[in-house]
Amino acid sequence: MNQAFICDAVRTPFGRYGGALSSVRTDDLGAIPLRALMQRNPKVDWQAITDVIYGCANQAGEDNRNVAHMASLLAGLPLEVPGATVNRLCGSGLDALGTSARAIRSGEAELMIAGGVESMS
């Protein structure tokens, strides 16, 4: 069985309820760490990403229903890179990480992006 490693980590910004980030859509918020990840790792072949998996429990309003894929497109990842959004309430981001690790360990994937994003305002 393959080993899975976390190669880099970027934190989404956070704020207070009704604060400066309250008007930022969840998919736009999710694109911020993806852009930073791409800038910090210029040698990565971004087309080699097997999948982008994001946890998001509150997919409502004008947010895109597949926050992971829309955030990846907004960040500039290739259209061909798929995305999946996991809803496991408070554990959504952790579930996305576990799903990605299992895909790598089982040989289904070689390079994944996993994370979580939420906007409660």
What residue spans do the PLM features occupy?
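Acidic, glycine-rich active-site loops and adjacent beta-strand->loop/helix elements
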Residues: V10-P13, G55-Q59, R88-S92, G116-S121
